[in-house]
Amino acid sequence: AQGVEFRDLTFGQALEQARTENKLVFMDCYTSWCGPCKNMLKNVFTLPEAGEFMNAHFVCVKYDMEKGEGIGLKKQFAVRAFPTFFIIRPDGTVQHRLAGGSQWERFRERVARGLEETTSYAYLNERYQQGKLARKQYSHYVQALKDAGDRPAVKNVCMEVFGQLSDKAKCS
């Protein structure tokens, strides 16, 4: 058994391969000096169970955000922290965004939420922006924002939801 298979592809080739294989693209945005990035590559992505899960669902690629194609991708996807991971549809649109590394079990949960359309960052964010987010979806949305590392949005959404509650509900 092997770990995650990161393929040596350009971003365009990765999208094409994802279309061909009917998968999503998993993109690891890292830098050479980032400690958590190195930890993910050495201790998490090398696990056989990580490989089994990730390789089944994704065309996996990684790019150094300070070299080559990574420089443009960093701008295109507004990468502000390392590591940042994206789940990208074959049409190039982002389905889910994950900021920061973690142990495999936790990382797998975070990735799984992004695989599921209705708990993915893009879906929930779009519903929220359109004012169509159901009350029971707010907890999923806050989780997706946390996964994406968007702390200001987490605070705003929580304050908004709290503000909509009745006085009785606020105290229960």
Where are these regions (language model features)?
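TPR-adjacent "capping" and linker segments in tetratricopeptide-repeat scaffold/adaptor proteins
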Residues: 114, 118-134
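A short beta-strand-turn-helix
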Residues: 7-24
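Thiol-based oxidoreductase modules, predominantly thioredoxin-like and allied folds used
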Residues: 3-9, 29-31, 43-70, 79-82, ...
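Detector for the c-type heme attachment site
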Residues: 38-42
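Non-catalytic, surface beta->alpha helical segment in thiol-disulfide oxidoreductase systems
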Residues: 79-120
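Oxidative protein folding and maturation machinery
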Residues: 128-172
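Short active-site neighborhood of thiol/selenol oxidoreductases, capturing the structured segment around
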Residues: 21-34
